[in-house]
From Swiss-Prot:
GO terms for biological process: maturation of LSU-rRNA from tricistronic rRNA transcript (SSU-rRNA, 5.8S rRNA, LSU-rRNA); translation. Keywords: Ribonucleoprotein, Ribosomal protein. Transmembrane segments: none annotated. The gene is rpl30. HAMAP family: Ribosomal_uL30_A. This is Large ribosomal subunit protein uL30. Part of the 50S ribosomal subunit. Pfam families: Ribosomal_L30. Gene3D superfamilies: 1.10.15.30, Ribosomal protein L30, ferredoxin-like fold domain.
Length: 154
């Protein structure tokens, strides 16, 4: 499971980049989507790597961002009661986050759960939004370090 966070805006960008971000449901800066580890998704992520930060997310971080930023239809917060009443297999956010991290379930297994997480800008800010993570910036592939970025954006 990959977490993809839009870091840069789309003003003066090519149409194919805008279309790919739209297919990933990334319409605004600091929005996050969780995508499965498939060749199709990785191809889309690589295409927009200069506008997003992405990496493998773990179960603890998934649990944190689902508890703090998970929303259902009507903009109500995601709760254990909502998951228990709308899912026959999961009884809490913790169980659902662990299943998501293992790849055993998807976000659409919970009806009414919004697929985009609207995150806060990172505490202490981005390093720079014009360089890759390897060069000391905030763009591109983070690997497991995406968990620290998501924790700052909780």
């Amino acid at each position: 499971m990959y977490a993809v966070v839009q870091v840069r805006g789309v003003v003066n960008t090519r149409k194919d980049i805008k279309d790919t971000l739209k297919m990933l449901r990334l319409h605004h800066i600091n929005h996050c989507v969780l995508v499965a580890d498939t060749p199709e998704n990785l191809g889309m992520i690589r295409k927009v790597k200069d506008y997003v930060a992405y990496g493998e997310v773990d179960a603890a971080t998934l649990e944190t961002i689902l508890k703090t930023r998970g929303r259902v239809i009507g903009d109500d917060p995601l709760t254990d009661e909502y998951i228990k009443s709308n899912s026959s297999t999961y009884s809490s956010i913790v169980e659902f986050a662990q299943a998501l991290a293992k790849g055993e379930s998807r976000l659409r297994d919970i009806p009414g759960l919004k697929p985009v997480l609207r995150l806060h800008p990172p505490r202490k800010g981005y390093k720079t939004t014009k360089r890759t993570f390897v060069q000391g910036g905030a763009l591109g592939y983070y690997g497991p370090e995406i968990n620290t970025l998501l924790y700052k954006m909780r």
